[in-house]
């Protein structure tokens, strides 16, 4: 990740360099756009767009980890994500990284057997699912509560 600019042929020195402020600024801008795309897709009830934003965020986080030499996506998280993707879901790390916490969204059209197979695969890999649900706030319109 070099700020989105092609710098030509990479040398060993280029690959070993420390990330610069431009690299991180590029990551932040791309992350901001990814969040905006996610929110827009949620507002439009566009599951394809939601899944695309989740996948894009994963790619950005993996790139940041590679750029900084930091483990963001552990082997366990990689297994969680790859098996979710193989079963029609979209997934990414959650939190600061390295802590084996991930978010998985599954297509509501997925079959029960696909979901059961996914959960069995996770169980064999010692991945534990937390059964969480989205909370819908009371009377919220455009991010402003009627109680305010």
What is the predicted role of each segment?
Residues 1-92, 103-148:
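C-terminal nucleotide
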Residues 100:
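Conserved glycine-rich beta-strand-loop-beta hairpin in the small C-terminal domain of fold type I
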């Amino acid at each position: 990740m070099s700020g989105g600019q092609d710098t030509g042929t990479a040398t060993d020195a280029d690959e070993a360099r420390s990330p610069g402020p431009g690299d991180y600024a590029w990551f932040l801008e791309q992350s901001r756009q990814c969040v905006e795309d996610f929110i827009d897709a949620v507002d439009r009830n566009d599951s394809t767009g939601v899944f695309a934003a989740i996948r894009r965020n994963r790619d950005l986080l993996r790139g940041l980890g590679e750029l900084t030499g930091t483990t963001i996506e552990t082997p366990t998280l990689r297994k969680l994500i790859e098996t979710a993707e193989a079963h029609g879901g979209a997934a990414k790390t959650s939190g600061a990284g390295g802590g084996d916490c991930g978010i998985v969204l599954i297509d509501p059209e997925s079959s029960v057997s696909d979901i059961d197979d996914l959960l069995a695969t996770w169980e064999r890999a010692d991945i534990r699912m937390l059964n969480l649900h989205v909370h819908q706030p009371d009377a919220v319109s455009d991010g402003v509560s009627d109680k305010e």
